[in-house]
Swiss-Prot record:
GO terms for molecular function: GTP binding; magnesium ion binding; uracil phosphoribosyltransferase activity. Belongs to the UPRTase family. Allosterically activated by GTP. Its EC number is 2.4.2.9. Pathway: Pyrimidine metabolism; UMP biosynthesis via salvage pathway; UMP from uracil: step 1/1. It comes from the Bacteria. It comes from Myxococcus xanthus (strain DK1622). This is Uracil phosphoribosyltransferase. CDD domains: PRTases_typeI (cd06223). One of its GO terms (biological process) is uracil salvage. Pfam families: UPRTase (PF14681). Its cofactor is Mg(2+). Keywords: Allosteric enzyme, Glycosyltransferase, GTP-binding, Magnesium, Nucleotide-binding, Transferase.
Length: 211
């Protein structure tokens, strides 16, 4: 099955690090470090088309014209709580980015998202916004977060995740065909509880050591 709204970052380092994260014996500290490392590599691909402009600068040897990022500062939005792991990695690459958080939890019965927190930078209009969440499972949380952000009319929206599955990608494409997804892998399917298979377990619990 092909997903035109999704780019899988096909790189040996990404594949290797993801395999280490999947292992049940991987410690919380290692899981956290690996997620930050993969996030850097995902960010490189997701931000490939950011606009640049030419600026006159002075090097130690001569004056020259060189490219710098153009436009308003990038905004990174983490879907709490596991999205913080990807956010931390991306901030190493773009430390000047503005940061927002959306708190959503999944109702265990309906699998629908319930919002409990929303705090993003003001004036999102015309800004490039990247939404971060390790797992694109049912896609319901991603759909809800993107819908909320669209009310502020951002210039562009992208979604960065560690793992996706066909169900989540299809759901997101149906509701937000304009949003491109960047991921390390597309796994097989969801189980009856809405978890990705083969997956890596609950990303939030493994990231924060809460289980």
């Amino acid at each position: 099955m092909e997903f035109p709204n999704c780019t899988v970052v096909d790189h040996p380092l990404v594949k290797h690090k993801l395999t280490q994260m999947r292992r049940v014996e991987t410690s919380t500290a290692s899981f956290r470090a690996l997620l930050q490392e993969i996030s850097l590599l995902l960010a490189y691909e997701a931000l490939r088309d950011l606009k640049v402009r030419e600026e006159d600068i002075q090097t130690p040897m001569a004056r020259t014209v060189a490219p710098v990022l153009d436009g308003k500062k990038l905004v990174l939005v983490a879907i709490m709580r596991a999205g913080q792991g990807i956010l931390d990695g991306m901030l190493q690459l773009v430390p000047s980015a503005r940061v927002g958080h959306i708190g959503l939890y999944r109702d265990p019965e309906t699998l629908s998202p319930v919002e409990y927190y929303y705090r993003v930078p003001g004036q999102l209009a015309d800004r490039d916004v990247v939404v971060c969440d390790p797992m694109l499972a049912t896609g319901n949380s991603a759909v809800a977060a993107l819908q909320r952000l669209k009310k502020s009319k951002p210039g562009s929206l992208r979604f960065v995740c560690l793992l996706a599955c066909p169900e989540g990608l299809t759901n997101l494409r149906e509701h937000h065909p304009d949003v491109h997804v960047y991921t390390a892998a597309i796994d097989e399917r969801l189980d009856e509880h809405g978890y990705i298979l083969p997956g890596l377990g609950d990303a939030g619990d493994r990231l924060f050591g809460t289980k």
